[in-house]
A protein has these predicted regions:
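Acidic, metal-coordinating helix/loop segments flanking the phosphotransfer/catalytic sites
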Residues: 33-58, 66
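Alpha4 helix (beta4-alpha4-beta5 surface) of REC/receiver domains from two-component response regulators
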Residues: 69-73, 77, 84, 97-116
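Two-component signal transduction core modules
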Residues: 57, 91, 114-115
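Receiver (REC) domain switch/output surface
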Residues: 124-133
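Conserved phosphotransfer cores of two-component systems
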Residues: 46-51, 81-89, 109
Length: 133
C-alpha cells in the first residue's frame, strides 16, 4: 500500500497505540509507533536521516520521559526536542485530560493542536487540515 503521509505516534498505553495505529493505517496513513520519549526521539531521528521523514507527530502528554520513568508533561519535552531537529514538524498533543491550561501550554510550546483522547471523531479531520497547510 502506498501511504500519503507518515505519522509518528508516541503513547505509552498499548491498547490506545494499537487502536490508533490500526484506524489511521486503514485510512491511508503510515503510522510508526513508540511508547516513550527515548524511543520516540530515536525513531524520529532515524526517519529524518532517511528519504522518508515524518509528516506529523501525535504525542501523548504524559508518557515515560527521557529518564525512562513516567513523567507528567513528558510529551511537551519530546515536542521541544523534535522541534529542535525539525522546527516545522506539525505536532498534535494527545491527552486524556480536557484542561484548557494544558492546551495553552502545548500550543505555546509549538504544538499545532491539542486533542483529547477518547473522542476519536475529529482527529483525522484535524490531521488532514494540518497536513494540507
Amino acid at each position: 500500500m502506498q501511504y500519503e503521509h507518515k505519522i509518528l505516534l508516541v503513547d505509552d498505553e498499548p491498547l490506545i497505540r494499537r487502536s490508533m495505529q490500526k484506524t489511521l493505517s486503514r485510512l491511508g496513513f503510515e503510522v510508526i509507533t513508540a511508547d516513550n520519549c527515548i524511543e520516540g526521539l530515536t525513531t524520529f531521528e532515524a526517519a529524518q536521516r532517511s528519504d522518508n521523514p515524518f509528516d506529523l507527530a501525535l504525542l501523548d502528554l504524559n508518557i515515560p520521559g527521557f529518564t525512562g520513568q513516567p513523567q507528567e508533561g513528558a510529551g511537551l519535552e519530546l515536542l521541544s526536542r523534535l522541534h529542535e531537529k525539525s522546527p516545522n514538524l506539525p505536532v498534535i498533543i494527545l491527552t486524556a485530560y480536557d484542561e484548557v491550561h494544558k492546551a495553552k501550554v502545548a500550543i505555546s510550546r509549538g504544538a499545532r493542536e491539542y486533542f483529547v483522547k477518547g473522542r476519536d471523531e475529529g482527529l483525522v479531520d484535524l490531521m488532514d487540515a494540518i497536513l494540507e497547510k
